[in-house]
């Protein structure tokens, strides 16, 4: 039996006993993870409904992929940048395909468990009743402004002296 699973933004065709390298999944060597995002399952030429199916896998090792050279250049500007990148990978051995989702493995592949408790905590916090708002005090009438002092004419500047 085979299955198409999605993990790390990529899709993999797996069967029991296969070894695959996927984007990093939290866990140590020997841990069992469950890949719950099964897109398609089948047996030979027969395609089955993938709802409720999971794929269980064992983590073989946490490793890093080959170095990829990232070279940037802008012609005629003397601009060259060379960087390397090594992607973190997890090597998995597929144990079983098509188990029911009720089986609880040691670790879950999806990190959605952490997001749920935070949402519940936020929902519990606004349960307190809001304090009643006080009525605004009535506005006082503005006091009339004192009449401005008598205006004086602007001082005149002395004329520049003439050279003889």
From Swiss-Prot:
Keyword Ribonucleoprotein part of the UniProt annotation: yes
Protein name: Large ribosomal subunit protein bL21
Protein origin, superkingdom: Bacteria
Task performed by this protein: This protein binds to 23S rRNA in the presence of protein L20.
Feature: compositional bias, Basic and acidic residues: 101-121
Gene coding for it: rplU
Family: Belongs to the bacterial ribosomal protein bL21 family.
Record-level GO cellular component terms: cytoplasm; ribonucleoprotein complex; ribosome
Biased composition (Basic residues): 154-164
Region (Disordered), start-end ranges: 101-164
GO terms for MF: rRNA binding; structural constituent of ribosome
Keywords: Ribonucleoprotein, Ribosomal protein, RNA-binding, rRNA-binding
GO biological process: one example: translation
Assembly and binders: Part of the 50S ribosomal subunit. Contacts protein L20.
């Amino acid at each position: 039996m085979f299955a198409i699973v999605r993990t790390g933004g990529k899709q993999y065709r797996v069967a029991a006993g296969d070894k695959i390298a996927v984007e990093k999944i939290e866990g140590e060597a020997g841990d069992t993870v469950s890949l719950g995002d099964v897109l398609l399952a089948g047996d030979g030429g027969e395609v089955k409904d993938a709802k409720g199916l999971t794929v269980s896998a064992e983590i073989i090792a946490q490793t890093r992929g080959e170095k990829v050279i990232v070279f940037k250049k802008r012609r005629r500007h003397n601009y060259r940048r060379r960087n390397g990148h090594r992607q973190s990978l997890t090597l998995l051995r597929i144990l079983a395909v098509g188990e029911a989702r009720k089986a609880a493995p040691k670790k879950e592949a999806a990190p959605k468990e952490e997001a749920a408790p935070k949402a519940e905590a936020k929902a519990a916090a606004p349960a307190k009743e809001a304090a009643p708002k006080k009525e605004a005090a009535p506005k006082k009438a503005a006091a009339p402004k004192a009449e401005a002092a008598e205006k004086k004419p602007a001082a005149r500047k002395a004329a520049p002296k003439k050279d003889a």
